C-alpha cells in the first residue's frame, strides 16, 4: 500500500490533488503547513512519499515549514512540489524565486513524465502561478515554450542526486493533460 503526506499550504487545489492520488489506492494524509514535531518527522519516514501543495505568497512566507521538511527529508523519501511546493524545493536548494504570470501553456520537457505514459513533447498544462524558480543546484526538466515568455519560464525541476522533483504548473487541473499520470510517477518512484 502506498501512502503520501500532502503538506497543505492552504490552497483550494489541495483536495483536487487528494482526489487525483486516491484512484491509485493511495492513502493520502493531509497536514497543514505548520511546524512538525521531531516524532512526526520520524513517522513521515514510514510513508511512501511527500507532496508539497500549491499555495499563496513566497515560499519564505507561506511554505517555511515545507522548506524545513525538504531540508530534513530530501534524499530519505521522494518529494514532489507543485507550484508553491516547487518554489519551496528550488529555494531550499539555493534557487531564486521571481515574478511570473499564470495561464495555459505548452510545457516542453526532457522526458521526465515518460516513465508511466508517452506524453507529447509539448504538454498542455494549466499554470496558476505568479512566481517561478530560477535554477541554482537543480536540473531544469521542463520549460514553458510560449513565444510571449522570454526567457522561458522553468516549469519542472529535479534535484541532480535526490528523488526531489517539482512542477510549477498544476497537474491536477482540468487544463493539464496527463496530470494523473504525472502524479502517479511520484507514487511509483523509489528513493535512491
UniProtKB/Swiss-Prot annotation:
Q: Which GO terms describe its cellular component?
A: cytosol
Which top EC class is named for this enzyme in its record? transferase
Which SUPFAM superfamilies does the protein's record reference? Class I glutamine amidotransferase-like
| Coiled-coil intervals, chain numbering | none
Q: In which pathway does it act?
A: Cofactor biosynthesis; tetrahydrofolate biosynthesis; 4-aminobenzoate from chorismate: step 1/2
Q: Where is the active site?
A: 83, 170, 172
Please indicate if the UniProt record lists Transferase as a keyword: yes
Give the Enzyme Commission number. 2.6.1.85
Could you give a GO molecular-function term held by this entry?
4-amino-4-deoxychorismate synthase activity
Q: Name one GO biological process term.
A: tetrahydrofolate biosynthetic process
Q: Name the catalysed reactions.
A: chorismate + L-glutamine = 4-amino-4-deoxychorismate + L-glutamate
Start and end of every Glutamine amidotransferase type-1 domain? 3-192
Q: Provide the alphabetized UniProt keywords.
A: Folate biosynthesis, Glutamine amidotransferase, Transferase
Q: What does this protein do?
A: Part of a heterodimeric complex that catalyzes the two-step biosynthesis of 4-amino-4-deoxychorismate (ADC), a precursor of p-aminobenzoate (PABA) and tetrahydrofolate. In the first step, a glutamine amidotransferase (PabA) generates ammonia as a substrate that, along with chorismate, is used in the second step, catalyzed by aminodeoxychorismate synthase (PabB) to produce ADC. PabA converts glutamine into glutamate only in the presence of stoichiometric amounts of PabB.
Known partners and oligomeric status = Monomer. Heterodimer consisting of two non-identical subunits: a glutamine amidotransferase subunit (PabA) and a aminodeoxychorismate synthase subunit (PabB).
Q: What is this protein called?
A: Aminodeoxychorismate synthase component 2
Organism of origin: Streptomyces lividans
